Amino acid sequence: MEQRAVVRQRQIPPVTLGPMLGTARLRTGLRGRECARLAGIDHAYLIRLETGQRAPSRKVAEQLGAVIAFTAEERAELFAASLPDVGKDHPGKRAA
């Protein structure tokens, strides 16, 4: 069976997503490094999310949702902007 590479298109997140993430994180009382550690993501990646340079994957959105006290509206915005997971562990991704 032939496997085809799965390519994830880079998506520009909504302009409100980054500031909303930073505001919610601060409201929760978390510093950037602490939030990244608790969510299991790299601090530099969290910065890219908060500055609007990246849109989170669905998995990262779930991880952030577990550590940041989002309002219902913020959580909906986060998940609406998230991308399907096609990371290194995704079954559609070819082994290198």
Give the predicted meaning of each segment:
Residues M1-T28, E62:
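A short, Lys/Arg-rich alpha-helix, primarily the initiator
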Residues E2-R8, R58-E62, A66-A96:
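Short amphipathic recognition helices of helix-turn-helix/homeodomain-type DNA-binding modules
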Residues L21, G32, H43, R58-A61:
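Helix-turn-helix DNA-binding elements, focusing on the entry/boundary residues of the two helices
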Residues R25, A36, G65:
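The alpha-helix within a helix-turn-helix
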Residues T28-R48:
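Short alpha-helical DNA-recognition segment
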Residues E34, Y45, A55, E74-E77:
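Residues in the helix-turn-helix
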Residues H43, R54, S82-L83:
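Short secondary-structure boundary/hinge segments and terminal tails
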Residues T51:
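Short, conserved catalytic or interaction motifs in soluble domains
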